[in-house]
Amino acid sequence: MGAAASIQTTVNTLSERISSKLEQEANASAQTKCDIEIGNFYIRQNHGCNLTVKNMCSADADAQLDAVLSAATETYSGLTPEQKAYVPAMFTAALNIQTSVNTVVRDFENYVKQTCNSSAVVDNKLKIQNVIIDECYGAPGSPTNLEFINTGSSKGNCAIKALMQLTTKATTQIAPKQVAGTGVQFYMIVIGVIILAALFMYYAKRMLFTSTNDKIKLILANKENVHWTTYMDTFFRTSPMVIATTDMQN
């Protein structure tokens, strides 16, 4: 659950920073009328993720783009070295970007500016737009809560979607491993119980069904100093046969 908790914490931190940056740098607010509305949000393979849409709109699309990038950079800087080590693989899987821990911020900035300033995005004048994400996983018993922040512009929403693709890709990498890890732990516990039960039955059988002579031998074998007469007494417990002298004479 620790990994799932860290993902959720990162998602929450990222959303808070995006809202704050949009408000500070792009004069966005929840009360501003949005030129673009989110019609539908599709997750093709949803395995335990919840989604809400929040409006933080403004008229300055370029400032929105810069605000989103600034929030992403600050959030990445706050990750632990272990968390940062996973990020390049997430970029490759989600955005097909080849990057490294040291260049990930610059590479993401270049990707967003090139993609979100393209004519396909800028010329999109649809007032109601749909957002499609491939897949998202929640940890067992703990759904991942996502927040898509609608900036009110195609540019800003393009950058938000890029970040959403990264965070959902992180859930697909970690949550299934947690499920698999839980299964391995379960089987290891079962195997351990079986081994202990077998050992118990073995010793119980030795103690309950071993002959009296064998029990005495086992007990004596565990003693450090045993007088030889004790062994004699043990091995000759059966009374000797008495042969009459008359029989021998006959």
Swiss-Prot record:
A UniProt-annotated Pfam family: L1R_F9L
Ranges for region Targeting to MV membrane: 2-12
Key words of the record: Disulfide bond, Host-virus interaction, Late protein, Lipoprotein, Membrane, Myristate, Transmembrane, Transmembrane helix, Viral attachment to host cell, Viral envelope protein, Viral penetration into host cytoplasm, Virion, Virus entry into host cell
Disulfide bond is among the record's keywords: yes
Cystine connections: 34-57, 49-136, 116-158
Bilayer-spanning residue ranges: 184-204
Lipid-attached positions, N-myristoyl glycine: 2
Subcellular location: Virion membrane
Recorded family membership: Belongs to the orthopoxvirus OPG095 family.
General function of this protein: Component of the entry fusion complex (EFC), which consists of 11 proteins. During cell infection, this complex mediates entry of the virion core into the host cytoplasm by a two-step mechanism consisting of lipid mixing of the viral and cellular membranes and subsequent pore formation.
The name this protein goes by in its record: Entry-fusion complex associated protein OPG095
UniProt organism field: Vaccinia virus (strain Western Reserve) (VACV)
